[in-house]
């Protein structure tokens, strides 16, 4: 029998019970895949992170695996923030860079000191932007969201963007409409099976607001009807905006940095900063920065 330390972390916020909750098991060595899936199902967060200490000869500092209540996923933004926030408050890694092994590759994570607490910067995987989706598929998506195609922004192609875990980018014109969406989740799940992409990120843009983007992310195909605040949607959003030259006036030379807000419609408001490094006019590197707070901690004996 072993005692496993379990944290409930609210990511992308400093306020408990806001932002995006993630489970973190900080000493996961010894757990098998079935046990990790059972723990993730028991905690019932959108994702739970399992932290493994590697062998000393490894070319990375820490391994983290991510499970939804129903399946393992390659990477998760808010659970990465949560996992490294736990490592910081435990004193394992309190400042500077660590290399994190994931199913999406080895990624750089930076622990920062901000206002007497910690913030976590996640360098995401190489951005990839796929071609716009077929018009028939776009029509299915808008019907599933309960909107018309005239609600879509003309400058925003509906396509998949990824920095490790792809999302369909759907830019719409109106913030009130965004907050009032009530999607047909079974229809979205069917579309996911068709296009082999599990997440739909609906967003608005306002270049004159403190928060450039507001968004909502739906992923019913993997058991997440709505994710409150999504690192692996907003990082790809930054790459997508650079790729298509949207909000180009806000770019500062070879860098594009902005803040987003998400989760307002479901009472889990959170925010993050997105940074995109630009090379030859295209997104080359994407980073997100988020805060976190401990909601509670406990242990499980297995």
Describe the role of every protein-language-model region.
Residues 22, 26-36, 40-62, 66-68, ...:
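Acidic/His- and Gly-rich active-site-bordering loop/insert found
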Residues 17-20, 76-77, 112, 211-212, ...:
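Short glycine/proline-enriched turns and hinge-like loops at secondary-structure junctions
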Residues 1-18, 147-150:
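N-terminal, positively charged, Ser/Thr/Ala/Gly-biased leader segments
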Residues 45-63, 187-223, 257-279:
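Conserved phosphate-donor
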Residues 73-76, 224-238:
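Short glycine/threonine-rich catalytic loop with a Thr-x-Gly-x-Asp
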Residues 38, 60, 67-192, 242-302:
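Acidic, low-complexity central loop/insert segments
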Residues 23-27, 84-85, 171, 237-239:
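Short hydrophobic alpha-helical segments that form membrane-spanning helices or hydrophobic packing faces
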Residues 21, 25, 79, 166, ...:
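Gly/Ser/Thr-rich beta-alpha loop segments that engage phosphate groups in nucleotides
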């Amino acid at each position: 029998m072993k005692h496993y330390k379990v944290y409930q972390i609210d990511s992308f916020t400093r306020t408990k019970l806001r932002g995006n909750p993630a489970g973190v098991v900080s000493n996961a060595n010894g757990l098998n895949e079935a046990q990790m899936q059972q723990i993730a199902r028991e905690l019932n967060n959108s994702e739970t992170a399992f932290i493994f200490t590697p062998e000393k000869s490894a070319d990375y500092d820490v391994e983290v695996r991510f499970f939804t209540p129903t399946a393992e996923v390659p990477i998760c933004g808010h659970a990465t923030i949560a996992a490294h926030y736990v490592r910081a408050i435990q004193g394992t890694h309190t400042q500077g860079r660590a290399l994190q092994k994931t199913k999406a590759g080895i990624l750089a994570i930076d622990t920062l000191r901000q206002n007497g607490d910690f913030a976590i910067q996640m360098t995401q995987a190489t951005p990839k932007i796929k071609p716009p989706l077929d018009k028939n598929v776009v029509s299915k998506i808008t019907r599933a969201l309960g909107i018309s195609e005239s609600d879509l922004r003309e400058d925003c192609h509906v396509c998949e963007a990824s920095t490790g875990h792809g999302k369909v980018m759907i830019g719409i014109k109106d913030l009130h409409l965004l907050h009032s969406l009530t999607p047909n989740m079974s229809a979205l799940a069917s579309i996911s099976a068709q296009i082999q992409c599990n997440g739909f990120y609906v967003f608005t843009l306002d270049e004159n607001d403190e928060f450039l983007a507001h968004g909502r992310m739906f992923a019913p195909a993997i058991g997440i009807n709505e994710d409150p605040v999504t690192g692996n949607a907003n990082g790809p959003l930054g790459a997508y905006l650079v790729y298509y030259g949207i909000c180009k006036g806000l770019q500062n030379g070879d860098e594009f940095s902005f803040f987003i807000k998400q989760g307002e419609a479901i009472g889990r408001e959170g925010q993050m900063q997105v940074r995109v490094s630009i090379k030859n006019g295209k997104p080359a590197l994407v980073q997100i920065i988020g805060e976190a707070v401990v909601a509670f901690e406990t242990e499980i004996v297995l």
